[in-house]
Structures are given as C-alpha cells and as structure tokens.
Amino acid sequence: MTTGNKHLPTTTVTPARVRLFQPTQRPASRAGEWIETSWGKCKVDGRLGQRHADLLEAILYCAERARPEDAGTLKLLIDPARVRQVMSDDRYSLQQLWRLLRELRECTIDVETPTMHIMGGVIESAEHTEELTRRDPLTGGERRLWTVRLGKAWVELMRLDLPLRYDPSPITRLRHGISQAIARHVLTHRGEPQGGWVIDGLIGAVAGDRDGQARRDARRRLREDKAGLVGAGVTVCGDRVHRLRPLVAHSPDGVAHPPDGVAHPPEFSAPLQDPQGLSGP
C-alpha cells in the first residue's frame, strides 16, 4: 500500500496537546513524572523531544506499506532516503536516525485523556537487512530499506485519537524545539481564538510555566523561526500567533487562548479506521 500521507496519519492531536514530546531538540531523560493539562495527562520513561517527533512523523508520512500484526503492532516498510529528505537537508546521517529510533524504542509512554488510557511503547523494533533493497540512483548500487514496527500503544493511539495529516518537512526544518512544539500544537486546532493566540499562552501550553529569562528566550527563539513557521502554516505577528489556513473564528477566551482550555475541533474530525484496513497487498 502506497501511503504518501493518504492512508496513515502523520500524527494525532493528543501528543502535542498533552506535551508528550519535550519542547526542545535536546530533551532530558524523564523518569515517569506526570504532566497534566486540561486535555489530559502523560508521563514518559525515557527521552522524547522534538527530533523524536520529527522522525516518528517522517516515518508515518513516508511509509510505503503498512501491515497489521497479530500482536497489535503495525509493520511499516520505510525508505530511509525519503525519511532523511523529510527530516532535514543533509543534517542527519543514518547513524543519527538510528540513535533516535533506539531512543524511541526504549521509552515507555502513559497517556490518559477523558476518552482513552494507553500505556506502552512507541516503537517495538526496527531493522534493515540486505533482503529489502532498492536501487540507489546516486551510486548505482543498492540501498537497504527499513522495517519499523510501531508499538501496540502507538497503534492504539492512532486508532482511538483524532488524526492529523500534513507534510512534516517544514516543521522538521525549524531551528528551535520551542517553535516546533508550538507549530505542532497550533496545527491540532482547526480554528483560533479571536485575535489569535498570545505567544506567552502558547509557550505555557507546550512548555509549562516559564518566567523571566526562560520566557524571553522562548519568545526570541520563536521569532527567529518566524520565516520557517510560515511554511508550516503558522505566522507570528507581534505578540500573537495565527494559522495560515481558512479559519473559523472563536469568541475570545478572556485573555489569549488559554493553553489549557477547552480544545478546539481538530483539523480532521474522524478517528483513524481500524488498523486492519491498513493492510498492504
């Protein structure tokens, strides 16, 4: 089954809303402390940051075949050259991608919302062997393909949560993790509060309470990514953030859109179909 972002979601709305991935490209290892938001809560044993989100979204966006397995995992066929192309402009070696895959495999997530409670792994396994190859037009030789097994917990999250489908390339090219986290958060909303989101409110939504120098640094980094954010469908104007899509205006929520308020409808309103419908030939 050729996906090209047609049959598998790039991600779902909950990870960005419950702060599953730290808003940095250099995440610290977490030891299972709960992070609570009004959309739900999560905890992570391991290391998950925006580069891990980049890779996971790139894998789902580039997956060429998806086959459900009896254990509840989902086996994906991946061309690593396409993943590298989505991830960056020659900034990532295969060894670096493999390190991110290892950290994704080693972590355990626990996500709880009013409609679901899921605990388990993100990736069950990854492998590349000489049995699956493709001609490399640059060298004339063969390059090895990957098979990546999504963990049962992530497969269930895709099945139960609301899917989002977009090209992750513009987000992966942003310089700062805080900008990536804010872009991912904004894209979980179909509409925006009247006047847009206040920057400080979004910083709080993706990074928790920050004040003083930490907040000023976050604002500065977001503005440094202003041009790149436009490619992701997000614009920064003064102290406000807007979506660059047809929007449905919402009434003001007092001050800026409170990061932990009632969720706006997501970009796509139907949950992913049963993974059995994802089988390739």
Go through each PLM region and give its residues.
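Charged, alpha-helix-forming regions
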Residues: M1-P281
